[in-house]
Design a protein with these regions (language model features):
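Glycine-rich, flexible N-terminal cofactor/catalytic loop recognition
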Residues: 1-47
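Adenosine ribonucleotide-centric catalytic and binding domains
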Residues: 38-50, 126, 130-136
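Alpha-helix C-terminal capping segments
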Residues: 13-18, 84-88, 111-112, 139
Length: 147
């Protein structure tokens, strides 16, 4: 049975590259994690925000201390994740974000629901209780639109 491992940025940095594993790398805008050695890495850059409409005009502080406009998860990103799942029906996945608690948990939970992969949470996250609602809603919307 294929798995989906969900972890934090720190957890991902500690992982040893494995052939055939699909990595969905979620980071804050402008702060991607270098992932040399992994075969297939799909990068998404968006902030951990819940409601798209409420945050589009807001500014957030980045890890490097700079400020930037909040970037929310979008329908286009959800479509890309759906395509990744379609293109890789049997491979193991690793999904990470900075904390490994909200964004990556939402994507990992969705992967488990839609593909019946076993989802394993490691590090900061022990369950999917803090899964990002906006990410889940837009991914589930893609399923609904395709049915």
């Amino acid at each position: 049975m294929a798995i989906c491992l969900v972890l934090s940025r720190t957890g991902m940095e500690e992982e040893t590259p494995r052939p055939g594993v699909i990595v969905i790398s979620i980071s804050d805008p402008g702060d991607p994690l270098p992932l040399e050695g992994w075969d297939k890495v799909f990068r998404f850059e968006f902030d951990d925000c819940e409601e798209r409409e409420a945050v589009l005009a807001q500014v957030t502080r980045r890890r490097d201390g700079s400020f930037g406009k909040v970037v929310a998860f979008t329908e286009d990103m959800a479509k890309k994740i759906m395509k990744i799942l379609e293109d890789h029906p049997t491979e193991d996945f690793i999904v990470h974000c900075n904390a490994g608690v909200s964004r990556s948990v939402a994507v990992g939970r969705f992967i488990g629901e839609e593909t019946r992969r076993k989802v394993l949470f490691r590090g900061n996250c022990l369950s999917d209780v803090h899964a990002n609602g906006l990410v889940l809603r837009l991914l589930h919307r893609q399923v609904w639109l395709r049915s």
